[in-house]
Amino acid sequence: MEAQNIRIRLKAFDHRVLDQATGEIADTARRTGALIRGPIPLPTRIEKFCVNRGPHIDKKSREQFEVRTYKRLLDIVQPNAATVDALMKLDLAAGVNVEIKLA
């Protein structure tokens, strides 16, 4: 396992929860002796929706909504068996999407 890297990509709608989850992962990996690169903030995806306010007329009267998706990237450079075991047992907050890849 020493030759491989672990790339963790986190997504969430709330940046405070995302930063907290990123910190928990980083602390867990550091405690097991692994090296960490990051957290690297990736570009925020902003989806905008425009809807009519009224049900019938008034096309000029509209309301705009947006959903922001925040993303972070963590690289664990020298993982060992204890690092992988600790990451599997880690319980993160709800609302954080985690993608793990071996690179």
From Swiss-Prot:
What GO molecular function annotations does the UniProt record carry, in alphabetical order? structural constituent of ribosome; tRNA binding
Per the record, the domain of life is Bacteria
* Annotated GO biological process: translation
Matching Pfam families: Ribosomal_S10 (PF00338)
Q: Which SMART domains match?
A: Ribosomal_S10
Q: Which SUPFAM superfamilies does this one have?
A: Ribosomal protein S10 (SSF54999)
Cellular component terms, GO, for this chain's entry? ribonucleoprotein complex; ribosome
Is NADP one of the keywords?
Answer: no
What keyword terms does UniProt attach to this protein? Ribonucleoprotein, Ribosomal protein
Function noted in UniProt = Involved in the binding of tRNA to the ribosomes.
- Subunit record text: Part of the 30S ribosomal subunit.
Q: To which protein family does this belong?
A: Belongs to the universal ribosomal protein uS10 family.
Q: Which HAMAP family match?
A: Ribosomal_uS10
The name on file for this protein is: Small ribosomal subunit protein uS10
